[in-house]
């Protein structure tokens, strides 16, 4: 009986680690790799990339399964330098924003994309959007809305793209970690001709983070974006960026963790618990 009680308590605790947590600010940030390159400076969370130290990556909060995730940041400049904000599951499901410096118009191209089980359908599931201001000049609010029925990608609260579960048989729907990374894509058609290291350091600068959990599911409407490339003008204007810089900056630094995130509950854990009970 005691073993069963312990099992149920452990099961409940492990399962609760999967639940999305409402977050505002930087206190739930976990450095995924390259700790020295992630720094809290003047009220901003800055992620660095240099030739000697490489890029950096963070995870925000616990894993999520449906919610609205907003990160306000200024992307880095530079050929081959990719600033990315995305949801990533262990089975390869992925939903992302990527600021690609070599696509169409350098420093003004946003890519939205999704991948199912790691299948690399890059040109099928990707959409590109051109802004009228360089992405490295201003802080923009990037939002991913995830419901059981659809994903939405938003820029400064304006809808860029929507993918419905009913429009594809490769809809990513696995509990995922929330990540931001800055990295060198290496020379090539997607990333660019190569990094000009005379421009370093390259910085992805974050001014705000907000996570809202479990929005009500609604019936999806058809995709509003019908072309591969769309030009954005008014939505990128500084006057519409309400979260450009926090107005209540203080010298107190948030608690940023430098540990690996706890993995979601999986069936191997359940099997080990059952083995413990009955053996």
Model-derived features: where do they sit?
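N-terminal signal peptide
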Residues: 9-20, 275-279
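Extracellular/lumenal carbohydrate-interaction signature centered on repeated Trp-anchored short motifs
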Residues: 59-67, 130-137, 170-171
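Localized edge beta-strand/strand-to-loop motifs within extracellular or lumenal beta-rich domains
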Residues: 136-152, 156
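Aromatic sugar-binding interfaces of carbohydrate-active proteins
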Residues: 152-210, 214-218, 222-225, 230-232, ...
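Secretory/extracellular carbohydrate-interaction modules
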Residues: 47-111
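Extracellular glycan-recognition surfaces and repeat-rich motifs
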Residues: 24-43, 96, 100
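Short, aromatic/His-centered strand-loop micro-motif at the edge of beta-sheets
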Residues: 118-139
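Cleavable C-terminal sorting propeptides in eukaryotic secreted/cell-surface proteins
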Residues: 255-279
């Amino acid at each position: 009986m005691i073993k069963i009680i312990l099992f149920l308590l452990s099961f409940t605790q492990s399962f609760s680690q999967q639940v999305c947590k409402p977050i505002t600010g930087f206190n739930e940030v976990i450095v995924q790799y390259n700790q020295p390159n992630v720094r809290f400076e003047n009220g901003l969370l800055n992620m660095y990339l240099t030739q000697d130290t490489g890029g950096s990556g963070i995870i925000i909060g616990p894993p999520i399964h449906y919610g609205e995730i907003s990160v306000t940041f200024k992307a880095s400049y530079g050929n081959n330098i990719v600033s990315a904000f995305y949801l990533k599951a262990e089975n390869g499901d992925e939903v992302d924003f990527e600021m690609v410096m070599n696509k169409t118009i350098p420093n003004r191209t946003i890519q939205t994309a999704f991948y199912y089980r790691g299948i690399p359908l890059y040109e099928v599931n990707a959409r590109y959007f051109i802004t009228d201001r360089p992405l490295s000049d201003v802080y923009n609010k990037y939002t991913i809305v995830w419901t059981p029925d659809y994903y939405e990608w938003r820029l400064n609260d304006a809808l860029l793209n929507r993918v419905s579960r009913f429009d594809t048989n490769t809809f990513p729907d696995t509990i995922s970690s929330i990540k931001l990374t800055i990295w060198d894509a290496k020379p090539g058609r997607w990333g660019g001709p190569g990094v000009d290291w005379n421009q370093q350091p390259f910085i992805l600068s974050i001014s705000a983070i907000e996570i809202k959990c479990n929005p009500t599911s609604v019936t999806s409407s058809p995709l509003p974006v019908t072309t591969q490339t769309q030009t954005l003008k008014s939505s990128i204007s500084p006057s519409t960026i309400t979260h450009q810089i926090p107005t209540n900056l203080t010298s107190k630094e948030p608690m940023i963790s430098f540990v690996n995130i706890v993995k979601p509950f999986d069936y191997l854990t359940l099997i080990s618990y059952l083995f413990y009970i009955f053996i």
